[in-house]
Amino acid sequence: MPTATLVRLALLEARRGGLAWLALALIVLSTALAAFLSQVAITEGRALQVAVVGALLRAVAVFVVASHVIASIRREIDDKRLEMMLALPLSRTQQYLGRLAGYAASAICLSAAFALPLLLWAAAPAVAAWGISLACETALVAALALFFGITLAQFVPAFAATAGFYLLSRMMPTIQLVAASPLAEPSPLQDAARFSVDAVALLLPGLDAATRTEWLLYGTPGGAAFASVLAGLLGYGVLVIAAGLFDFHRRSL
């Protein structure tokens, strides 16, 4: 199938680009960091190890996936390879979804690799939930990176947009708490700021509820809560894919 061919090409590019070696190096570095923390921690050394390493691997996975996807699609556009691919008897929808499936598969493989070292400090069910959530989160980041990589003309703006979107989604609950602080004096400006923040929050995915470090520390979340998190990520991913397809169909490359 043509789509399967595009998936294989994306995975082959990730392998030839050294993504596997980069992942291995990052895992080794994170394990070394955990060993260092075990020596300096006075109490709760195991909890400190899993919390720091889990947060580090999650952040690294997101930004590695984003940079890989954007660099790949920008290279195809700049080298005119994407134009050559569009000349083939494949619809733009097949072209877009095939690439996205390949990038998402790379993100899922990276997430699985990053979850494995956490088995040294956390229970297997908790690591499994964390890894599944990270896989969905990085797949969503891959969709965002592909959208911004095609929409924006250069690597830096596309990466900045993807990173900014991700960080804003992660930090939005904190921003909402600050905006709704009871210590602030009531005023029309304060009400407008709170309303604006809440409106922006409605447009963003609930990444703050995904891939939580406390899952590794205190056990897996409830089934309904976990399913709600995954459904939110997948639902927002569908919206990003729809926006990407719309832009890709109207764009002249």
Language model regions located:
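Central hydrophobic cores of alpha-helical transmembrane segments
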Residues: 24-28, 157-169
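Terminal transmembrane helical anchor/hairpin motif
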Residues: 163-247
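Residues that define the loop-to-transmembrane-helix transition and helix capping
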Residues: 21, 83, 93, 155-156
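Secretory targeting signals
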Residues: 28-72, 96-158, 177, 223
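Aromatic- and glycine-rich beta-strand/loop motifs that create alpha-glucan
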Residues: 1-24
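Helix-loop-helix units of permease transmembrane domains in multi-pass membrane transporters
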Residues: 71-102
